[in-house]
Amino acid sequence: MQIQCPDYILKAIDILKYNGHSAYAVGGCVRDSVMGRTPNDWDMTTSATPDEMKLAFDGYRIIPTGIKHGTLTVMIDSHPVEITTMRIDGSYSDSRHPESVSFTKKIEEDLSRRDFTVNAMAYSPETGLVDPFGGRLDTERKIIRCVGNPDKRFHEDALRILRAIRFASVLGFGIEEETAASIIKNRCLLNDISKERIRAELIKLLCGQNVEKVLLEFKQVIFEIIPELQATDGFLQHTPYHIYDVWTHIAKVTSSIESTSDLRVAALLHDIEKPSMFRLDEKGVGHFKGHPQKGAQTAEEILRRLRFSNAEIKHIATIIYLHDERPDGNRHHLAKLCAKFGIDNVDDTMKLIIADAHGKNPSIIEQEIQVAENARKQISEMRAENACLSIHALDINGNDIMALGIDRTQIKDTLDYLLDSVIDEKAENKKAALEKAAVNYINKK
């Protein structure tokens, strides 16, 4: 099999070969090439030690990115190329890093330490594809399979548990039976992994094309990371709007929404407090009053634990808080919602409402989708018009208010009143009109 490597990779291979070393493209770039995809990044492995690499690339900019494990980054024709010495890993004690590594000249030994067969392939123009573990066949069959014993692989680095289901989600692959069983068996090892690493893999997993299938098949892994979701599994909703239990509904909504990290995370957590807020009325119909508000609070706690940024937490929690809002077509009501919570947050809430509908009874969701889509059209019109949706967009400011003789303690209330007046079309967003409205407001208080 021939793979089209970029010129800068071929150049790196030629330089190492000229200096007496073997060199290969390796890992995900080879997998993607076998799949017919264009790789985002190209990594290499070589028989050269780090010191030998430095000699071979004399005159090139070299960054010692992982010198302890034999990794250098070499700038070749303005491209950063990560090159790692072929190695054999020693024992693992922290479920993440080998305690020691020993270098090897054999590509097969280096490939044997890798996580999955689809990532355990190497390529050079001289040798062609090097595939000692059947990675090409697994790639063609769309199967994620551990190299060697799955239990051993996951005990070496527990993050591989999440990586496996992330690859299944992103690539649309299935997971081989023995590997899948080991994932479930060893999921508790994820508790030894840093929250930052968990967060990064979880986001990639959630943004994958096959996320619904993965969330349903490997729900135990998700519950290990976010135990607060466990109660949603199998929880029946007892309402004609819902034909799925809460967890299945969550999986469908997550798959339906736009594939951005904040929206996918919001979808995952949006109904997390439905079980705790469930009430059955005298007719046997289920209700979940208050679950968005409580869910937003729980989401904040989870996201803080998983080391999301403050901006991400605020955005996601706001969307969850608002997701039971049902716009009635009244532009003034929608504009006030945008003024209070931010136009981007309200627009993203409408996206969640539309996805939410796709996780409900298909026979009765069309009206709900149409209402939210109409709201998004109105939001788009507001953007185009540069509609006044915050006090900062008013043609008057706090200094102007004080110049009218109004006490500084009344500034915020006055500006809020003026914004409402502009949104309700009771006042024009012009300074003179706003000054008059401000004076009238204070005089009536």
Label the model's feature ranges:
Residues M1-K445:
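Catalytic cores of the polymerase beta-like nucleotidyltransferase superfamily
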